[in-house]
Design a protein with these regions (language model features):
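General small-molecule cofactor/ligand-binding pocket signal
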Residues: 35, 86-90, 141
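Small/aliphatic-rich secondary-structure junction motif
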Residues: 2-55
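Structural beta-alpha unit
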Residues: 77-110, 147-148
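Glycine-rich, Arg-bearing micro-motifs that act as flexible, cationic patches
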Residues: 109-131
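Short, hinge-like loop/turn segments at secondary-structure boundaries
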Residues: 49-53, 104-106, 128-129
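A short acidic, glycine-rich active-site loop
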Residues: 54-68
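Short, flexible loop segments at boundaries between secondary-structure elements
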Residues: 138-146
Length: 148
């Protein structure tokens, strides 16, 4: 195993996912890439809000969101204490961007957490981990993060 992609979100359990994936990668002498995927804001708003006024995110909104994501990943990288860790921010569908990034960097394994997000998000986009598991052509290491 030469490259490991660790997909992180803003959930507090991401620390556990990052640490577990990093330890596994280092034990195998693999390079690590941390990934955060941002999504269009309309997925997080009420379906009834501005029903007829669908607008795409402005370039400024996307830039602000991406800066926040990059800062989040830089903080995770500092926590892991390895300057060789790469960081990647993508915008779009979670599962699709995770799979595309894994392909782009030629990852040998994807590391993700098993927690679910907000109930509305699960209805709208389904379980990201489940979708990546179904569509991935490389091993997926799932870190259980649900509280006992």
């Amino acid at each position: 195993m030469k490259k490991v992609l660790i997909a992180l979100d803003y959930n507090p359990t991401s620390k556990k996912v990052a640490e577990t994936g990093f330890e596994m990668a280092k034990a195998m002498g693999a390079e690590v890439t941390l990934l955060h995927v941002t999504v269009h804001s309309f997925l997080y708003t009420s379906v009834y809000e501005n029903m007829g006024d669908w607008q795409t995110d402005s370039k400024d909104t996307i830039a602000i969101r991406n800066t926040g994501s990059r800062n989040f990943l830089e903080k995770a990288k500092r926590h892991l204490g390895d300057n060789a860790v790469q960081i990647v921010v993508r915008d779009g569908d979670f599962a699709q961007k995770i799979l595309e990034t894994a392909d782009e960097i030629k990852a040998d394994c994807i590391v993700m957490g098993s927690h679910s997000q907000k109930w509305l998000e699960n209805i709208l986009v389904g379980s990201v981990t489940e979708e990546v598991l179904r569509k991935s052509t490389i091993p997926l290491f799932i870190v259980p993060t649900k509280k006992q």
